[in-house]
Regions:
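Acidic, glycine-rich A-domain
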Residues: 1-174
């Protein structure tokens, strides 16, 4: 979250550049047993076209990154909200991910091959719309070949394995 905050502050100083920050997770409205009250959610935490940095400074301290990450489902849900790239305008999708897209409730079981392939399909759709994708792997399993392999499978050439707590390391890849 610190790296994202630093990037938002830096980008805010560049004239003519808009930034939208979203978080994807799950919401559990279920007070009992079972998974029927669990839903994927996408929170637009900051939109430079509408919000000021005061929002970042006052509200982001209450954000917690947790829950499962239904990546492809969330990308698909907001695809039409993303600004497409054009010859006179560049558009970037910057993603931090643990490389494990998954979600489940009583109606949906989204994980493993299905989730990986769906996320890869959504990333290809972003690219086809002229949106440049930059995806960074985060998580406790940094040295896990399996998770890094899954991450590469979803994001391909656009995947990076850097220390996401280092804004300098991230900026070198941009």
């Amino acid at each position: 979250l610190k790296s994202v905050t630093a990037m938002v502050k830096a980008i805010d100083m560049i004239e003519g550049v808009d930034v939208v920050v979203s978080f994807r997770s799950t919401q559990d409205n279920n007070s009992g047993r079972g998974r029927s009250g669990s839903y994927p959610i996408m929170l637009i935490a900051y939109d430079s076209r509408k919000d000021s940095l005061v929002k970042v400074k006052t509200l982001w301290k209450y954000l917690r990154v947790n829950g499962t990450t239904p990546e492809g489902l969330c990308y698909e849900a907001v695809m039409d909200e993303m600004v497409e790239g054009m010859k006179d305008r560049e558009s970037y999708f910057l993603n931090f991910s643990d490389g494990m897209p998954m979600f489940g409730n009583d109606d949906v079981d989204y994980h493993s091959t299905e989730a990986l392939d769906h996320t890869r399909k959504m990333v290809k759709e972003l690219r086809s719309r002229g949106i440049k994708v930059m995806s960074y792997y985060i998580g406790d399993s940094y040295n896990s070949d399996r998770y890094m392999g899954d991450f590469k499978r979803m994001y391909g050439k656009d995947s990076e394995f850097v220390d996401v707590t280092s804004v300098t390391a991230i900026s070198r890849t941009m």
